[in-house]
Regions:
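Membrane-proximal basic amphipathic "stem/tether" segments
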Residues: 1-30
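Active-site and donor-binding regions of nucleotide-sugar-utilizing enzymes
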Residues: 23-174, 191
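Nucleotide-sugar donor-binding and catalytic loop/hinge architecture
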Residues: 12-22, 174-193
Length: 194
């Protein structure tokens, strides 16, 4: 526990001392979200964006991205809370709901961007305020965009920019797939978590 605190503190100091322009900062809670945002990072890099930083609470992400991105490991919640309060960047891109409830927003971060890690309805599995404090939302499709606009009207939430990006996770699966593979057909039984 103390080791995580110390590593988190050291990485927070390194992050704040990094004088590079912080254009795109991604935050990931776990390596299990990696496939949900990796295609977005790769597309930004393909378009020539160089100022991409990953802050992660999973040490495995640091190892995975060490040759690709600047990464900072911050796992300790107290240090993470400080990071979120003092963050100075143009875009913070994350998949954390109820922003401003558990972790506070920084006045120095221009745009908070949410991307989905589920294809579910925004009105069925999330809290009413799950997306209230975001500036930009990357929606998986028209159904989510319509639900988000409906919530803005119904609850008088601030209007946000909603961009239909599709589901990044499906891009990741497609990029990994080997379409030339000849296999016998299988039946997949995949129960949902709801």
């Amino acid at each position: 526990m103390f080791n995580n605190f110390l590593k988190s503190l050291v990485n927070l100091i390194k992050f704040t001392r990094n004088n590079k322009k912080k254009e795109f900062v991604f935050y990931s809670e776990s390596k299990f979200y990696r496939d949900y945002y990796i295609s977005l990072i790769l597309e930004l890099k393909r378009l020539g964006q160089k100022n991409i930083i990953l802050v992660t609470s999973d040490i495995d992400d640091v190892d995975f991205f060490k040759n690709t991105l600047t990464c900072y490991y911050i796992k300790n919640f107290f240090i993470l809370s400080i990071f979120f309060k003092i963050l100075n960047c143009k875009f913070l891109i994350l998949t954390l709901t109820d922003l401003g409830e558990h972790l506070q927003k920084s006045k120095l971060c221009k745009f908070y961007v949410y991307f989905f890690h589920a294809l579910a309805s925004t009105q069925k599995i999330y809290t009413k305020t799950a997306f209230k404090n975001y500036d930009i939302i990357f929606s998986n499709g028209k159904y989510q965009s319509e639900e988000l606009r409906s919530a803005e009207k119904q609850f008088s939430f601030p209007k946000k920019e909603i961009v239909d990006t599709g589901y990044f996770f499906l891009d990741s699966i497609r990029n990994k797939a080997n379409f030339r593979l000849k296999e016998k057909k299988h039946i997949l039984f995949a129960p949902s978590w709801n």
